[in-house]
């Protein structure tokens, strides 16, 4: 296969992956994202939709008490969505490869922080969280498949 044909195939696959990823990402906000751990003899655990999780974690950015507790990881997870939107905006500028790559790395690190938070609190991830992560990774996979463009 010629280099140009391979490049076109990779570009098409990345575009399809990003579009599919964005659709899954948005869909995940309307699904149950996590719930509290059930305790024997206790009330039914609270279940949180993805949109509620996103809102609560982003709003808590402005709480100084949160930054000095174990819940600061929730604030970091709240910044995944704005960072992903910034990443999508930067896709409009092909020469901004390195800022996109740095954002992608930060997003992946914040995802790991979310999982640590789930273990500490403890929360149980549900289908909305799994699809949210899958959508994000489908969007970001293009960074692993592309080489930096020569300037």
Which residue stretches match the model-derived regions?
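Compact integral membrane and secretory-pathway proteins
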Residues: 2-151
């Amino acid at each position: 296969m010629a280099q140009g044909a391979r490049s076109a195939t990779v570009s098409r696959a990345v575009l399809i992956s990003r579009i599919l990823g964005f659709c899954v990402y948005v869909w995940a906000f309307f699904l149950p994202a996590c719930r509290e751990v059930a305790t024997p003899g206790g009330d039914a655990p609270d279940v949180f939709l993805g949109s509620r999780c996103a809102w609560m974690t982003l709003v808590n950015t402005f709480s100084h008490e949160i930054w000095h507790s174990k819940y600061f990881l929730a604030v970091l997870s709240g910044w995944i969505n704005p960072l992903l939107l910034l990443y999508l905006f930067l896709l409009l500028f092909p020469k901004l490869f390195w800022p996109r790559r740095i954002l992608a790395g930060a997003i992946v690190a914040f995802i790991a922080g979310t999982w640590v938070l789930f273990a500490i609190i403890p929360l149980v991830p549900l289908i909305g969280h799994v699809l949210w992560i899958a959508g994000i990774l489908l969007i970001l996979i293009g960074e692993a498949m592309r080489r930096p463009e020569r300037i």
